[in-house]
Amino acid sequence: SGKWWNDAFEAIGYDNAFQIKVLPDGAHPMDVRYNMIHWVHRATRGWSYGGAVVDPRTGEIIKGNVSLGSLRLRQDYLIATGLMAPYTDQNIVPSAMRELALARIRQLVAHEIGHTIGIQHNFLASTFDRASVMDYPHPTLNLSSDNELEWKNAYDVGIGEWDMLAVEYGYQDFPKGTDEELALEEIIQKGIQSGMTFITCLLYTSDAADE
């Protein structure tokens, strides 16, 4: 699911630039040449994180680090248990429970990778259908004609329209002589005209920018 971001970079002209591979044998996870996804076991509940090593002089992202806790899968499995209530006298795990949990993990991987490339939460993305993996999604369920829950589209697959826009804004190269400030404003206006909105958990003010 981390490769979902490749769609956004290909859209602005970077073919196959965003790749995910198994760490080479003998490589150290702290080697700055490698962006890392760490699968971490915890004995207690913990958050997943997406962070980066950044050059403070230029803002360049040098290395991305994602940490995914093992208990998140258990949490998602319990959500599925609560929704499906598969309680019988047999120890059978419905495949839909497993698929629901794995679908959420795939979405989470893309979310945390989004942070490593500089993209913040967008807690308004859910007001524009499924516009971003950078929101905190709940499972979207439907009722069938016989009043059974349908799980097929509980979580989305792929990044959303807002994610595509954010990558375009942050990474698009412009031809020499382009008024970049105007070009970036046009990207913002394109999103607004499409109905996309943005709110995050960080506060930016003009005073903070001046400091």
Tell what function each PLM region has.
Residues 9, 59, 73, 118, ...:
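Aromatic-residue detector
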Residues 115-126:
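Catalytic Zn2+-binding segment of zinc metalloproteases
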Residues 2-110, 116, 139-143:
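Metzincin-family zinc-dependent endopeptidase catalytic domain
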Residues 53, 67, 122, 132-133:
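Residue-level preference for alpha-helix termini and adjacent loops
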Residues 111, 118, 207-210:
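Alpha-helical hinge/cap motifs
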Residues 126-206, 211:
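Conserved catalytic/binding loops enriched for acidic/polar residues
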